[in-house]
């Protein structure tokens, strides 16, 4: 009885499930060949005029391929207050994807057929989604306002050693996207710009600069690993093209036979 004056409805939700994904080439389990005239051709009938192309193996099939597997856990709340004028929807989700289907870079040591599909990566996703709605009416005028906000977190959790430092933008040596969000990118970190020739001289006296050309008005790069050398080893993860926060606002109004709606995201 103590909630009747303000709580109109309350629902709790929970779900768990497993989904699969097989979105790769239909022929990924088969060896793939193609014809090539430039690297080799043959004259089988001996007349010296009829030339047939050679056949090269481009990709090796993988009979052990299986679907990606995504386990997802969801918790949710649906609530309404003040005679259903105020609404709240809140969701939390957690997704773990294993056996992601990826094609490794060409493996030259095996000769022909160096491309191959594998179940070889894992990724975690989690987030919170909230929607707040207010709706009311004043005589013939009705209106509703809805605001939604979402927070997402993504992380690559596993890659095979052969592509650990190259797939997804790694530097190929010692920095890997494992532990970073999908869509991450690497770059140099700036420490301002050179304002005078004296600053340029001092910078060149201190560092062995192997990238860029220091000069007045140009970017000064940081020596991240402290070896007094400015090179590709000083690149680091700078961010991701995957947004952490997403929000939107929807406003609707109606008066007699007229209505108006506005959406912003």
Predicted regions and their residues:
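Residues that define the transmembrane beta-barrel architecture of outer-membrane proteins
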Residues: 8, 69-73, 124-128, 141, ...
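Repeated loop/turn-to-beta-strand initiation elements of outer-membrane beta-barrel proteins
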Residues: 84-88, 128, 140-141, 257-262
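Extracytoplasmic loops and strand-loop junctions of Gram-negative outer membrane beta-barrel proteins
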Residues: 55-61, 110-116, 131, 172, ...
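Solvent-exposed loop/turn elements at secondary-structure boundaries
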Residues: 2-68, 87, 91-123, 176-178
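Transmembrane beta-strands of outer-membrane beta-barrel pores
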Residues: 16-20, 92-98, 134-136, 149-155, ...
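Conserved small-residue
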Residues: 26-29, 33-35, 137-239
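Residues on the lipid-exposed face of transmembrane beta-strands in outer-membrane beta-barrel proteins
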Residues: 1-2, 14, 75-79, 90, ...
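Conserved C-terminal beta-signal and adjacent last beta-strands/turns
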Residues: 144, 240-265
């Amino acid at each position: 009885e103590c909630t009747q004056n303000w709580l109109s409805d309350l629902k709790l939700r929970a779900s768990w499930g497993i989904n699969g994904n097989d979105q790769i080439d239909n022929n990924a389990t088969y060896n793939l060949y193609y014809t090539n005239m430039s690297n080799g051709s043959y004259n089988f009938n001996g007349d010296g005029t009829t030339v047939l192309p050679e056949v090269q193996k481009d990709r090796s099939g993988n009979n052990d391929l299986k679907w990606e597997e995504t386990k997802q856990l969801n918790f949710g709340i649906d609530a309404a207050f003040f005679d259903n004028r105020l609404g709240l929807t809140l969701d939390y989700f957690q997704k773990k994807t294993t056996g992601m289907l990826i094609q490794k870079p060409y493996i030259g040591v095996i000769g022909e057929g160096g491309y191959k599909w594998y179940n070889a990566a894992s990724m975690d996703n989690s987030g919170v989604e909230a929607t707040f709605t207010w709706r009311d009416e004043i005589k013939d005028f009705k209106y509703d306002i809805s605001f939604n906000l979402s927070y997402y977190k993504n992380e690559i959790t596993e890659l095979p050693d052969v592509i650990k430092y190259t797939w997804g933008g790694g530097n190929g040596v010692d920095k890997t996207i494992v532990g970073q969000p999908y869509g991450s990118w690497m770059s140099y970190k700036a420490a301002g710009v050179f304002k005078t020739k004296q600053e340029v001289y001092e910078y060149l006296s201190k560092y062995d600069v192997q990238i860029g050309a220091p000069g007045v008005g140009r970017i000064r790069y940081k020596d991240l690993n402290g070896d007094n050398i400015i090179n590709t080893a000083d690149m680091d993860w700078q961010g991701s093209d995957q947004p952490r926060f997403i929000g939107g606002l929807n406003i609707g109004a109606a008066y007699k036979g007229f209505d108006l709606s506005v959406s912003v995201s």
